[in-house]
């Protein structure tokens, strides 16, 4: 199944955090927090402004983004857990 987001929504796949600290301590799965960053898999066409024109999206497919721990709606697609959220729920794009 393939998802195509509508309006100003994006589909994001969480990127797992490191399970080992810089000092070498391994963090067990039970103590690990949900990752707060992910990769954009799909982008909607944008949000319409007051004049009816589409405002372009600030993110694109492949961008690594930061978001709140409880942002978006979780959906399962082909065994993968994905997030559907509005573009305004994203905090930043991680530059490499």
Swiss-Prot record:
UniProt keyword annotations, A-Z: Chaperone, Cytoplasm
GO CC annotations, alphabetized: cytoplasm
Keyword Cytoplasm: yes
Example of a GO MF term: ATP binding
Major subcellular site: cytoplasm
SMART domains: Cpn10
One GO BP: chaperone cofactor-dependent protein refolding
Gene3D superfamilies the UniProt entry points to: GroES chaperonin (2.30.33.40)
Pfam families for the chain: Cpn10 (PF00166)
Compartments (UniProt record): Cytoplasm
SUPFAM superfamilies per record: GroES-like
Quaternary context: Heptamer of 7 subunits arranged in a ring. Interacts with the chaperonin GroEL.
Family to which the UniProt record says this protein belongs: Belongs to the GroES chaperonin family.
NCBIfam families the UniProt entry points to: PRK00364.1-2, PRK00364.1-5, PRK00364.2-2, PRK00364.2-4, PRK00364.2-5
Function in brief: Together with the chaperonin GroEL, plays an essential role in assisting protein folding. The GroEL-GroES system forms a nano-cage that allows encapsulation of the non-native substrate proteins and provides a physical environment optimized to promote and accelerate protein folding. GroES binds to the apical surface of the GroEL ring, thereby capping the opening of the GroEL channel.
Name the record gives this protein: Co-chaperonin GroES
Phylogenetic lineage: Bacteria, Pseudomonadati, Pseudomonadota, Betaproteobacteria, Burkholderiales
